[in-house]
Amino acid sequence: MAGTVVLRCCTSVTKVRTWKRCSKQIKEQRARLYIIWKCAVFLLSSHD
């Protein structure tokens, strides 16, 4: 019984680590897209 509890605990910790890694990558990707978007808007609006 104790073995299953430890196994479940380790499995949930692995899932949390994977989620944190994925979440970090998503945030970085959103930041890149935001910067690209702002540059595009700036270039289009400054076109006189």
From Swiss-Prot:
Any one GO cellular component localisation term in the record: plasma membrane
Domain of life: Eukaryota
Pfam families the record matches: DVL
Keyword Electron transport set for record: no
Subcellular location: Cell membrane
Homology family: Belongs to the DVL/RTFL small polypeptides family.
Function (record text): Small polypeptide acting as a regulatory molecule which coordinates cellular responses required for differentiation, growth and development, probably by restricting polar cell proliferation in lateral organs and coordinating socket cell recruitment and differentiation at trichome sites.
Protein name: Small polypeptide DEVIL 14
Lineage: Eukaryota, Viridiplantae, Streptophyta, Embryophyta, Tracheophyta
Gene expressing this chain: DVL14
